[in-house]
Design a protein with these regions (language model features):
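Short, flexible coil/linker segments at or flanking structured domains
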Residues: 2, 7, 26, 31, ...
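Acidic, glycine-rich flexible loop segments
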Residues: 77-131
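Short, solvent-exposed mixed-charge patches
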Residues: 138-139
Length: 139
């Protein structure tokens, strides 16, 4: 498990550009699109080299079934971009991501913003999520 110092719990908000979609295997205008609302992200670096990262967006104090979006991936050498390998839109429902990236912004080692997008499919259905998250600076 990651050292406790490698987990950051960041309060903030998802911007209006955050949403999830659900539809057929090919993205289409008829896909069901839902605004994604969050006020918190938990960023966990799973290894000492800070290469394996998990970002989980959701509502602080949210119920088990409240909307969430999780992205699990590997940081690129630039230290700011992650290639997403797995994603989930419900707890314990990890799925391989067809494609996905997260771009992180840091102040020192603290995450101040994150933009993630990824999609996954199961059978003939496709889910996608795009999250644009900005931290609230400490006053």
């Amino acid at each position: 498990p990651a050292a406790a110092s490698d987990t950051q719990n960041v309060s903030a908000g998802c911007t209006q550009r955050s949403y999830t979609t659900y539809g057929g295997l090919k993205a289409a205008p008829s896909d069901q699109r839902t605004a994604f609302i969050c006020d918190n992200v938990v960023v966990t670096f799973q290894d000492a080299k800070r290469q394996h990262v998990v970002l989980e967006f959701g509502l602080r104090g949210g119920k088990k079934d409240s909307p969430m979006a999780g992205f699990d991936g590997t940081m690129d050498k630039d230290g700011m971009t992650a290639k997403i390998h797995q994603m989930y839109l419900a707890r314990d429902a990890l799925n391989p991501a067809d494609d996905g990236t997260c771009h992180l912004t840091f102040a020192g080692r603290a995450v101040t913003a994150a933009q993630c997008s990824a999609s996954m499919h199961q059978g003939k259905n496709r889910w996608a999520a795009a999250v644009d998250f900005k931290a609230i600076p400490d006053r």
